[in-house]
């Protein structure tokens, strides 16, 4: 068997956005792949029809698409190129029976979504920029004024609201999404939603007479991004907008689905703060009355961690009045259905269903099953694509050995990967990998970095401590960071060492990112059992995180279970920086300079404290990267990151 190489993630092809045609005779999806030489990702559209799979496009930048009709796909692209600064968006159409893609629509603003209408017109979700709200009209003078203003003020940032930046972007500058109507004959856009309100979660009714959407007032200093969004609808004949249902503290709307005879609302009662899972409610289309439909209290969608995904797709869909949805339960994500107020499993296997579509009783699921990267499967669970067979052929893929234990009054679930060429009685070093979130899970899925370490001769252990997803109230860790979760992790580490005497307790290493980075920082201040640690995109100080993260004020107070004023001492007690003078473990810190979720100052603080106390430390910073470095960062940066962590552990082996 050959080992998994450090750059083997570049050989993985990631699938996403699987979508049936209107009549269900074909399906389109995206396939993405990292390109090490060009240090980028390429994405193409693929077609599944009559049991055959073939590439539909070859430009390498196609990811956003929809069906125009049964035989034509519309996708976003830029095949013309721009000689001057431009906000223009272009969409192309391509026939499924062959031929080249043709330019179909050109919009004067950035467009993220289009919804084709039967009359040939479109609904369009596009960007609005404060002070230049009429850019959608295509006035060249206004476009020039926008870019002149941008250039004149490029040395300044004027901040007037929270948050002022978002991870993966830059300073928000107040830009937001609006809903427009596109007249195909006139080639013109008409604004449907008022300026100053951000549109999201747009869904078009099956009869195309009404469009539903969530709306958030972004004209205020602190928009309620985490307070749920109000649901509205517009009658397309009259263009009249109507409030459907409002969010409130005990009814925080996460999303919704359009059924045949009722609208299904997924909303949380806030019992466990901002991470509270949803229950289901029925909303009458005529009266707008809301009634409870089903108590659920589990996660909608997959929160199973993985580093070989690229792209998204549908996590739920109504078929008549039956909701099909992905849900994270325990250590995996499967497909379930809600019918007549009762939830039941549809297709649940070890691993993760990442997205799906359903049409005329047929289903296609994009899933991480059988310790393989993503493939498509049908409604019976039969695999229908083989994109990653060649990548895995002849390679050692460690199979997860489940390890569950009782810690206090609850169970902790986890897994162990054995090193390549494992021999009983021989000693092997161990890497303990801690997930982020904390409301996510590790599961039995193909995880490149873990497989790479197993191929290099390490045991890899990982688990889901208190605070993890998939078990209802188990995820409630508000005000308890560094207590029960730390105890769970140490208990799991002890249990793993007890199960496999081949694990070398003198060569025990630990790493984690985001919440896992917080926990790494906490661990080194509370135990010396690890020979070396690597803290990635971490939190070290809740009192400063409050003011620098894009989610700081909301997330820090929610997770610390208090308000920073007057309870600053509680925030400090839960901060790893408080215990930095206790650290003896050699620690590597990795941060991305454009990570605004766990900003780089968190790494600076911990690194400075350790160096000041004479602890061996190293800080590695990545330009042009954000919080997603390990999952979707530039390929060469991902390789450097993994080399840094692995090299740090190799350097400190006893």
Question: What name fits each language-model region?
Answer:
Residues 465-654:
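Active-site-proximal cap/loop segments of hydrolase catalytic domains
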Residues 27-31, 73-77, 123-126, 211-215, ...:
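Residue position within the beta-strands of beta-propeller blades
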Residues 19-26, 64-72, 114-120, 202-210, ...:
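Blade-terminus and WD-like Trp-Asp/Gly-His loop motifs, strongest in beta-propeller folds
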Residues 387-506, 513, 547:
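Cap/lid segment of the alpha/beta-hydrolase catalytic domain
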Residues 43, 128-180, 225-230, 278-281, ...:
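Predominantly five- to eight-bladed beta-propeller fold
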Residues 1-14, 47-63, 85-87, 94-110, ...:
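Multi-bladed beta-propeller domains
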Residues 37-42, 82-88, 170-175, 222-229, ...:
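Short, solvent-exposed loop/turn segments at conserved positions within beta-propeller repeat blades
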Residues 16-19, 156-160, 165-166, 170-178, ...:
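Non-catalytic accessory segments flanking enzyme active sites
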């Amino acid at each position: 068997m050959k080992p998994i190489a450090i750059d083997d993630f570049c050989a993985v092809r990631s699938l996403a956005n699987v979508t049936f045609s209107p009549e269900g005779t074909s399906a389109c999806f995206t396939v993405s792949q990292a390109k090490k030489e060009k240090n980028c990702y390429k994405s193409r559209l693929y077609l599944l029809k009559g049991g055959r799979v073939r590439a539909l496009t070859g430009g390498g930048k196609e990811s956003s698409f929809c069906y125009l009709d049964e035989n034509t796909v519309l996708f976003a692209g830029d095949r013309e190129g721009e000689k001057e600064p431009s906000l223009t968006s272009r969409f192309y159409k391509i026939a499924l029976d062959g031929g080249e893609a043709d330019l179909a629509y050109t919009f004067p603003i950035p467009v993220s979504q289009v919804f084709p209408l039967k009359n040939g017109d479109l609904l369009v979700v596009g960007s609005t920029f404060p002070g230049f709200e009429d850019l959608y009209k295509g006035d060249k003078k206004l476009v020039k004024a926008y870019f002149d203003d941008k250039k004149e003020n490029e040395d300044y940032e004027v901040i007037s609201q929270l948050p002022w930046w978002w991870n993966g972007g830059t300073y928000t500058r107040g830009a937001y999404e609006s809903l427009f109507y596109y007249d195909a004959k006139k080639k013109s856009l008409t604004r449907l939603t008022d300026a100053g309100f951000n549109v999201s979660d747009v869904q078009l009714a099956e009869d195309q007479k009404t469009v539903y959407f969530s709306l958030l007032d972004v004209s205020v200093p602190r928009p309620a991004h985490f307070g749920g969004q109000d649901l509205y609808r517009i009658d397309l004949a009259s263009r009249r907008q109507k409030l459907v249902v409002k969010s409130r503290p005990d009814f925080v709307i996460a999303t919704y689905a359009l059924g045949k005879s009722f609208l299904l609302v997924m909303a949380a009662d806030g019992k466990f703060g901002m991470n509270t899972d949803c229950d289901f409610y029925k909303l009458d289309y005529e009266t707008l009355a809301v009634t409870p439909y089903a108590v659920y209290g589990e996660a909608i969608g997959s929160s199973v961690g993985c580093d070989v995904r690229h792209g998204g797709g549908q996590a739920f869909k109504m078929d008549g009045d039956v909701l099909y949805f992905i849900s994270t339960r325990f250590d995996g994500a499967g497909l379930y259905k809600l019918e007549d107020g009762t939830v039941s499993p549809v297709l649940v296997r070890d691993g993760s269903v990442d997205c799906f579509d359903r049409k005329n009783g047929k289903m296609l699921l994009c899933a991480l099953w059988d310790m393989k990267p993503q493939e498509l499967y049908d409604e019976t669970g039969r695999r229908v694509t083989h994109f990653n067979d060649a990548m895995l052929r002849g390679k050692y893929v460690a199979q997860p050995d489940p390890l569950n234990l009782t810690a206090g009054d609850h169970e902790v679930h986890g897994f162990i990967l054995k090193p390549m060429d494992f021999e009983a009685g021989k000693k092997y070093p161990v890497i303990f990998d801690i997930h982020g979130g904390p409301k996510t899970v590790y599961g039995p899925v193909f995880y490149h970095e873990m497989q790479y370490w197993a191929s290099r001769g390490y045991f890899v252990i990982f688990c889901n401590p208190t605070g993890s997803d998939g078990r209802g109230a188990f995820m409630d860790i508000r005000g308890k960071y560094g207590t029960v979760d730390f105890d769970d992790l140490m208990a799991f580490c002890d249990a793993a060492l007890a199960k496999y005497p081949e694990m070398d307790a003198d060569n025990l290493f630990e790493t984690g990112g985001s919440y896992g980075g917080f926990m790494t920082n906490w661990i080194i201040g509370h135990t010396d059992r690890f020979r070396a640690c690597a803290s990635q995109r971490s939190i070290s100080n809740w009192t400063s995180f409050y003011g620098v993260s894009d989610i700081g004020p909301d997330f820090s107070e929610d997770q610390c279970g208090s308000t920073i004023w007057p309870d600053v001492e509680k925030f400090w007690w839960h901060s790893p920086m408080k215990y930095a003078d206790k650290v003896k473990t050699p620690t590597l810190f990795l941060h991305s300079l454009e990570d605004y979720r766990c900003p780089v100052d968190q790494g600076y603080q911990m690194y400075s404290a350790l160096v000041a106390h004479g602890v061996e430390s190293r800080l590695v910073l990545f330009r042009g990267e954000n919080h997603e470095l390990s999952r979707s960062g530039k390929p060469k940066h991902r390789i450097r990151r993994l080399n840094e962590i692995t090299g740090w552990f190799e350097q400190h082996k006893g």
